[in-house]
Amino acid sequence: MSTVTSNPSDRVLLITGASSGIGAATARHAAAAGWRLVLAARSRERLESLAQELGGPGRAVAAPCDVTDWEAQQRMAQDALAAFSQIDAVFANAGFGGPRGFLSDTPEHWREMVLTNVYGAALTLRATIPALRESRGHLLLTSSVAGRRVLPGSMYSCTKHALTAMGEAARQDLHGSGIRVTLIEPGMTDTPFFDNRPKDALADDDIARAVLFALSQPPHVDVNEILIRPTAQQG
C-alpha cells in the first residue's frame, strides 16, 4: 500500500471542474507547489491547453469527463491511475448555479444543476475512493456559503446544502481509512458563474489558496471545513 508523502512532487491531485474558475486556479497553485495533476472537465480543448501550460505529460494530464456520467467517471479514475499509478487527493469541484426564484429557472436547468452539483460529486467520490484508500489520501469538495444559509428560491443553495451533508457523510463513512475530508465553502467569488463581476468578491486564487492550505497539513490533521467570505459579505 502506498502512503502519503510530505513531498508534493510525488503526489497526484485530481480536480473536476478544472477547465476554468476555481478548478483552474487550484490547478495552477498546486502545480506551483509541485503536485502532479489530473484535470477533468467537459472541455477537452481547455483542459489540454491547461495541462500543457502546467508541464504536460509527466506533470499534468487532461481527463475529459462529464461528471454526470458514471462510465466517464470510471474512465477518469482509470486514466489518472494509468498516467501516475496513484491518486493522493481529489478535489470534487464541478458545479454551476442559476437564478433565484422557483419560477425563474427551467426544470431542465434544475435537473442539470442537481445532476452536476450533487450526483456528479457523489460519482466522483465513488470512482476515486478506492485509490484514496490505497494512498490514505485527501478528499475535498466544493460547497458554498449558500450551503450553510438558505437563499430564497435558490435551487443552487439546495444543491450546496446537499454537498455540505455529503462532505460530513463521507467523513464519517471513511473514518478509520486514513482518508481526510475537507469541505471548501466559498462566499461570493468572481467566477464564470457571474456575467458581471460582483463588487468586493473573492478571486478564484483566494479559494485555491484555501485548498492548498488544507492539502499542506500533515496526515494526522483533518481540516473538515474552510468557510471563506469576502470581508464585504455579511451573510
Listing of model-derived features with the role each one plays in the protein:
Residues 19-20:
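Conserved glycine-rich cofactor-binding loop
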Residues 33-50:
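Conserved glycine-rich Rossmann-like NAD(P)H-binding loop of the short-chain dehydrogenase/reductase
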Residues 45, 64-76, 107:
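The beta1-alpha1 cofactor-binding region of Rossmann-like NAD(H)/NADP(H)-dependent oxidoreductases
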Residues 179, 183-184, 197-235:
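C-terminal helical subdomain
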Residues 125, 159-160:
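Active-site helix of classical SDR
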Residues 101-103, 109-111:
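Substrate-binding pocket helix/loop in short-chain dehydrogenase/reductase
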Residues 144:
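Residue(s) in the substrate-gating loop at a strand-loop-helix junction
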